[in-house]
UniProtKB/Swiss-Prot annotation, chain A:
Top EC group: hydrolase
Domain of life: Eukaryota
Domain tr-type G: from-to ranges: 61-249
Name assigned to this protein: Translation factor GUF1 homolog, mitochondrial
Membrane topology: Peripheral membrane protein
Coiled-coil intervals, chain numbering: none
Family annotation (SUPFAM superfamilies): EF-G C-terminal domain-like, P-loop containing nucleoside triphosphate hydrolases
Record bears the keyword Secreted: no
Residues annotated as transit peptide in the record: 1-35
Cellular location(s): Mitochondrion inner membrane
Originating species: Sorghum bicolor
Disulfide pattern: none
Length: 665, 478
């Protein structure tokens, strides 16, 4: 899912922020409350305690672990809600829609950022054995959908044996459908195509079946037709899960070994890990160890998510649930790690990787004095999002702040939004950048996560520069192919594929420098395709590029927070645009201001902001000086909010605005 | 930072010789056109006097207008065009609204307790509006009588009244002078028919010339001010030059030049945004300001305050009260007083004002507005004194608010002394080269050995006064 539509939603989100500031404080205030109430809230389908002996009734062959994957808005969350209701896990009409998306940012954007699991019990009337209706234990593993989290997705999928591939019956296959399909396919999952929203007047399930056949070689007869909204066709879904998805393959008698899917920090319970038991059984009181860190823990509590924490004291092979083991920070709970019986050597499960940070930006308190508050907020948020890298940095313009590394754009965006929504932090972020590699004539190499840290005049020859790239998939109605090709080539893209997925729609694949898409690529793409384009990307390798550092100078003083790395051929254009933008957003001051973009000591763009002409209040009417004084006080406060470099005051908006330029035409 | 217990009133040169000097002789009226002398602020400073506690000034608000001008956001009462006063203003023509209001105002005057019992009389009275010239002279007299009875009037007080062209004739003005008015502030605003109409003024150019004729011919009235507005919609440089020429030709003793402010809630506020056509651009309107400064200086006027010019000795003493942060009474709708260190603005609506007067009489009103603290006081002093050509007296500022604060202020202004927006002066009010100024700032002990005053330059510093003063605000109240 996400990449595309996620970004589309960010505009909506901004309006919401403007219109509904209270929503903000509400979320901050109510978050802990919800956590509290969720532990034993009766409306969430509390079935009483599920005992360990009950779980023993579900050997691996009675367990199915599956995930739902879809392009954003194709109905994944609604389908999940329906399945939870159908199995009595939650009660219909109780609890909030999009049950598994717990974060405000997930609900607003319709995306999943954190993996969630839910255990359901389902009595299956098998077609073949009409006498026996055994009960099955079904684990729905809700995964993040976006490429930023593709590692997390791959770990979640690794705990599944099958996936429901949900496709909107009217919109058909979109960019993230393709990305998700391949992730599931590469994880060897059984895929059940679900063509959803068939109640729509424009639904064309046959066309979608054709697309599935053409793109994924899926037999049209395998597709289930549903409407999660009206309930039509839903009765086929769980039987298909049981019949078409294999049971988990683990060894029941082996020492316990489990995959860590995701973790949360709970103020009261500490770190809660979601795990899938691959081999053996896990009991309360067991000693377990992490393969990644070697640290050992005692299992303090273990249970299933039904749909909230339900202690069972045990989890058996193939089952999915939670473990609380006295970990103090989610940094100890690395996604994809193998937890195993302590003091035994086990083969770690494959695929574990440390987080890879692809997008970096500086985060600074909007109000310079608030560094401590921001620091506190970041610390708390990283308790729940260990995948962000944080290092302190100082800027001449913005003061003390943090250099943050993110998995990708969406991750960065979500991090910002959570900082604001859940912790009330007001931040200025610098132009996002990617990890470039510069190699010098003397053979030394540096990875550049902050352009300001790169010497403008290094005193030695730059031998080569590399930048990360992505493979982007774009699906568009065919009439937009021309402009999209033009956009991609402006962004230094290289075409890899150009095919038609049906009579109206084209699929384009491009290799693009990551830097070229991190700022405004998607907005532009949406703009030139009347909103029809869907877009997704995956990381690709580094490529050698002709890169230069561009400084922005105000009255000769470089503004470190505005430094950026650009492609040599685009430097002139980007520089010109940046200085023009700055000229617009920096207010006239009592002296002339020159705004320059420079590469090394060579100025490539320049604007002059002439001195302010007048700012005078002519009259103190009838001795009433209070109004005038208020005005001057306001003016003073305005100055206080400015960031200052040398003698030049820079309004915060200038920093926000610069984020919008860096790449566009 | 604020070391001394600060007297509630200003430490600024409170009494200028001009303020106690008798009216300048008639012969002097135009005598000084050549005196565009070194200091634009003609009277030399007098030594600091002990803080004078009781106010010696009173502002009286007379809110009536025929109609509201398009730029105006004052507390006014529009009477409508039918109530143009009959020349001579007999009893029969008196509008009951005016009579009732004056009654109310008189009640306020008598319910106001003088600050001191030892009878410091009023040195200045200012009838502002609205259009005070719409109020029958008989009623103006009753107000002056009430003020005299309550607070006392000095031997030769300055009694100013704002008058609009078209609202008075020679007889009426004579009557006003007869009851004690001795200074007129004539609201001309422009000399172009189109501009007057566009502003929603209730008079035309013909009335302007008539009014000027009446004022200049009036015996016993030597002191009058012409009020102009620059940066009006569609105003061109030629028009502005013409207005200034007409002004100089009319030979007022005082000129007030107001740069149009677009206020929210006014008709102009709905129609225009500052700096956008048909309003002149910032550059043009800055230019208008500079032209006024140039033309009026050439004609012998001192630019003694951001928007005020006068022939030597003809400063508006009442307004000097404001700029020197001295206390003043105020009476009437929406008016603001400054008594015992407390600024208070009266209700802007007639009904609320009437209720307020009632409470004042009953003794049940006590104001919520807190007395200003030292910081506020310092802000006021800086804000007001930097409006004047006299500038900020660093010595007395240091005395009241501490040397280090004065030094910080000077340090903040350092680049602007260098660029010429701010002028540093020695005891003799000679401008200091910025090198000398900077030398003075090297350490606190030396500070003040050379520099004694800072002021904003004319016209460039004045034009950026808000910026410069708000910089100072940032130092005083970070």
């Amino acid at each position: 899912m996400a990449g595309a539509a996620v970004l589309r939603r960010s505009a909506r989100r901004i309006y919401r922020h403007l219109a509904a500031a209270p929503a903000f404080s509400r979320s901050v205030l109510q978050q802990p409350k919800r956590l509290l109430s969720s532990q034993s809230s009766p409306e969430h389908g509390a079935r009483g305690a599920v005992s360990g002996s009950e779980l023993a009734l579900y050997p691996p062959e009675r367990v199915r672990n599956f995930s739902i994957i879809a392009h954003v808005d194709h109905g994944k969350s609604t389908l999940a809600d329906r399945l939870l209701e159908l199995t009595g896990t939650i009660q219909k009409g109780h609890g909030q829609p999009q049950y598994l998306d717990k974060l405000q940012v997930e609900r607003e954007r319709g995306i999943t950022v954190k993996a969630q699991t839910a255990t359901m019990f389902y009595r299956h009337v098998s077609a073949s054995q009409d006498s026996d209706t055994p009960k099955y234990l079904l684990n729905l593993i809700d995964t993040p959908g976006h490429v930023d989290f593709s590692y997390e997705v791959s770990r979640s999928l690794a705990a599944c044996q099958g996936a429901l591939l949900v496709v909107d019956a009217a919109q058909g296959v979109q960019a993230q459908t393709i990305a998700n399909f391949y992730l599931a396919f590469e994880s060897n999952l059984s895929i059940i195509p679900v063509i959803n929203k068939i109640d729509q007047p424009t639904a064309d399930p046959d066309n979608v079946k054709d697309q599935l056949k053409r793109l994924f070689d899926i037999d049209p007869s395998e597709a289930l037709l549903t409407s999660a909204k009206t309930g039509q066709g839903l009765e086929q879904v769980l039987p298909a899960v049981i019949e078409r998805i294999p049971s988990p393959p683990g060894k029941c008698d082996a020492p316990v070994r489990m995959l860590l899917l995701d973790s949360y920090y709970d103020e009261y319970k500490g770190v809660i890990c979601h795990v899938a038991i691959v081999d053996g059984a896990l009991r309360k009181g067991d000693k377990i160890a992490s393969a990644a860190t070697g640290r050992a823990y005692e299992v303090l509590d273990v249970g299933i998510m039904h749909p909230e924490l339900k202690p069972t004291g045990v989890l058996y092979t193939g089952q999915v649930g939670y473990v609380i083991s006295g970990m103090r920070s989610t940094k100890e709970a690395r996604i994809g790690d193998t937890l195993h019986q302590a003091k035994s050597t086990v083969e770690p499960l494959p695929g574990f990787k440390p987080a890879k940070h692809m997008v970096f930006s500086g985060l600074y308190p909007a109000d310079g004095s608030d560094f401590e508050a921001l620091s506190h907020a970041i610390e708390k948020l990283t308790c729940n999002d260990a995948s962000v890298s944080i290092t302190k940095e100082t800027s001449n313009a913005l003061g003390m702040g943090f250099r943050c590394g993110f998995l990708g754009l969406l991750h960065m965006d979500v991090f910002h939004q959570r900082l604001e929504q859940e912790y009330g932090a007001q931040v200025i972020s610098t132009i996002p950048t990617v990890p470039y590699i510069f190699e010098y004539g003397d053979g030394s190499k540096v990875q550049v996560e902050n352009p300001a840290a790169l010497a403008s005049n290094p005193g030695k020859r730059v031998a080569a520069c590399w930048e990360p790239t992505v493979i982007a998939t774009i699906i568009i109605p065919s009439e937009y192919v021309g402009p999209v090709i033009m956009l991609c080539s402006e962004r230094r893209g290289e075409q890899l594929e150009y095919t038609f997925i049906d009579a109206q729609r084209a699929l384009l694949k491009y290799q693009l420098p990551l830097k070229e898409i991190i700022v405004d690529f998607y907005n532009e793409l949406k703009g030139i395709t009347s909103g029809y384009a869907t877009f997704d990307y995956e990381d690709s390798e580094y490529q050698q590029s002709d890169l230069v550092k561009m400084d922005i100078l105000l009255n000769g003083q470089p503004v470190d927070a505005m430094a950026t790395i650009v492609h040599n051929q685009k430097a002139q254009r980007v520089g010109k645009e940046l200085v023009e933008k700055l000229k617009k957003f920096i207010e006239r001051q009592m002296f002339e201001i020159t705004i320059q973009a420079a590469i090394g000591s060579k100025v490539i763009a320049r604007e002059t902001l002439s001195a302010m002409r007048k700012n005078v209040l002519a009259k103190c009417y009838g001795g009433d000086i209070t109004r005038k004084k208020k005005l001057l006080e306001k003016q003073k406060e305005g100055k206080k909010r400015m960031k200052r470099v040398g003698s030049v005051d820079i309004p915060q908006e200038a920093f926000h605005e610069l984020l919008k330029v860096s790449n566009s035409k | 930072m604020l070391r001394l217990a600060f007297p509630l009133v200003s430490h600024l040169p409170r009494t200028k010789p001009a303020a106690v000097r008798p009216r300048p002789p008639l012969a002097r009226r135009y005598a000084s056109s050549a005196s565009t002398s070194a200091s634009s602020f003609s009277p030399p400073p007098s030594p600091l006097l002990p803080p004078p506690l009781p106010p010696a000034s009173a502002y009286v608000h007379l809110p009536f207008c025929r109609k509201r001008c398009h730029y105006c956001d004052f507390p006014i009462v529009a009477l409508g065009s039918s109530s143009a006063p009959s020349p001579g203003g007999g009893e029969a023509a008196e509008d009951p609204r005016i009579v009732d209001y004056v009654q109310l105002l008189l009640r306020e005057v008598s319910a106001t307790r003088p600050v001191s019992d030892d009878g410091v009389p009023l040195e200045t009275v200012f009838f502002g509006g609205g259009t005070p010239s719409l109020v029958p002279p008989r009623l103006v007299a009753t107000i002056l009588d009430a003020l005299r009875a309550r607070f006392g009037l000095s031997a030769c007080p300055e009694v100013s009244i704002e008058m609009d062209p078209g609202t008075f004739d020679a007889a009426r003005l004579r009557e006003l002078v007869g009851v004690g008015v001795n200074r007129v502030s004539l609201g001309v605003q422009a000399f172009q028919e189109d501009l007057l109409r566009a502003c929603g003024r209730a008079h035309g150019v013909k009335e302007v010339h008539e009014a000027v004729g009446i004022v200049t011919a009036c015996e016993g009235l030597q002191n009058w001010s012409m009020d102009l507005i620059s940066s009006l919609p569609n105003q061109t440089q030629e028009m502005w030059e013409e207005s200034l020429r007409c002004t100089v030709d009319a030979r007022p003793t005082h000129v007030s030049v107001y740069d149009l402010q677009i206020e929210q809630g006014t008709k102009f506020g709905q129609m225009y945004s500052p700096g956008v056509f048909p309003l002149p651009s910032d550059t043009e309107s800055a230019n208008f300001y500079k032209i006024a400064s140039k033309r009026l200086s050439e004609a012998g006027y001192n630019h003694y305050e951001i928007s005020s010019y006068c022939k030597p000795g003809y400063e508006c003493k009442h307004n000097l009260t404001y700029w020197q942060n001295r206390p003043f009474y105020a009476f009437g709708l929406g008016s603001a007083s400054y008594i015992n260190g407390i600024r208070y603005s009266r209700p802007r609506r007639t009904k609320e004002y009437a209720e307020w007067v009632q409470k004042l009489e009953d003794g049940t009103w006590c104001h919520e507005s807190r007395s200003s603290d030292m910081k506020d006081m310092a802000l006021d002093v800086v804000m007001l004194s930097l409006r004047t050509a006299w500038g900020l007296d660093l010595q007395s500022f240091s005395k009241s608010f501490g040397k280090s604060l004065a030094l910080s202020l000077c340090n903040t202004f350092k680049p602007f002394v260098e660029s010429g927006l701010v002028i540093a002066m020695d005891m003799d009010r000679r401008a200091l080269p910025h090198i000398d100024f900077e030398l003075d700032l090297q350490n606190e002990d030396d500070f003040g050995s050379r520099v004694a005053f800072i002021r904003l330059s004319d016209p460039d510093g004045f034009l950026l006064s808000n910026e410069l003063i708000s910089l100072a605000f940032g130092i005083i109240s970070p």
